[in-house]
Amino acid sequence: MTDSDNPRRVLLKLSGEAFGGGKVGIDTQVIRRIAEEIVPAVQQGVQVAIVVGGGNFFRGAELQQAGIDRSRGDYMGMLGTVMNCLALQDFLEQEGQATRVQTAITMGQVAEPYIPLKAIRHLEKGRVVIFGAGAGMPYFSTDTVSIQRSLEIHCDEVLMGKNGVDGVYTADPRKDENAKRFETLSYNRALVDNLAVMDASALSMARDNKKRIRVFGLEEPGNVTRALVGDEIGTLVSTAESRVAE
C-alpha cells in the first residue's frame, strides 16, 4: 500500500471526545477499536504519528468560564491528553504494535520528551508515536499542535477523525437536510465560511505551509485504516478548488 523507498507518513488527530465516547473519562471499547484499526495500516508500511486531545477530561476555555485561570486550565487539559496517550499506547501494545509516547511537558516516568528527530527515527522503525501534552504552553489548541508536529516530522497529510460527521459540509448536516459534503475544500473557503475543519489558527498554519488535511468520520468501522492508507474518504482540505460530492 506504500512505497518502501518513500513510505507514507501521516499524522492522525483524535479528539478527546472520541476517547470519551461523548462522556467524561475514557471509553475503552472506542479506544480498543481505534487501536485495532491503526495496526493494519502500520503493517502495510504506513508511518503513523498521533496527536490526541484532552477534552474528555478538561477544556481550558470552559474551565476559564467557571473562574479557573485560563493558563492553569490549559495545563490541566494537557495532562488530560497524556492520560489518553497512555490508554491508546496500552491498547496498541496489546495488539503487538510497538508504540512510544512523547510529551511536550517532561514526565520521564511515563513518556519520552518530545524530540522531533527521535520521533522520526521511531516512525522509520515501524513504531507508532503518540504526542501528548499539547504544545506544552497554554493558549495553543491540539489542532494547532497537530499541524505543527506534522510539519516538523515531515508528514504527507494530517488526518482529522471526527465524531458525528463523515467530512466537511456546506452546512450542519444534522440541522440542514440540504447540506452537501465537500470532496475537496480550499483552505480559504474553509476559513472565510468558518466551516468546522479545525480552529482558525491551525487552519491558517496549514494553509501557509500547504499541509493537506483529510477530515473523515471516526464512527464508520474501518475508516481509520482507510484514512491511514490513503483512501479518498471524507473531505480533503488543500489548495485545490472546492467541490461538493455528487
UniProtKB/Swiss-Prot annotation:
ATP binds at K13, L14, S15, G16, G55, R59, N163, Y169, D172. Pathway: Pyrimidine metabolism; CTP biosynthesis via de novo pathway; UDP from UMP (UMPK route): step 1/1. UMP binds at G54, D74, A135, G136, M137, P138, Y139, F140, S141, T142. InterPro entries: AceGlu_kinase-like_sf, Asp/Glu/Uridylate_kinase, Uridylate_kinase, Uridylate_kinase_bac. GO terms for molecular function: ATP binding; UMP kinase activity. Keywords: ATP-binding, Cytoplasm, Kinase, Nucleotide-binding, Pyrimidine biosynthesis, Transferase. Inhibited by UTP. GO terms for biological process: 'de novo' CTP biosynthetic process; UDP biosynthetic process. It is found in: Cytoplasm. GO terms for cellular component: cytoplasm. It catalyses: UMP + ATP = UDP + ADP. Catalyzes the reversible phosphorylation of UMP to UDP. Homohexamer. Belongs to the UMP kinase family. HAMAP family: PyrH_B. This is Uridylate kinase. The lineage of its organism: Bacteria, Bacillati, Actinomycetota, Actinomycetes, Bifidobacteriales. The gene is pyrH.
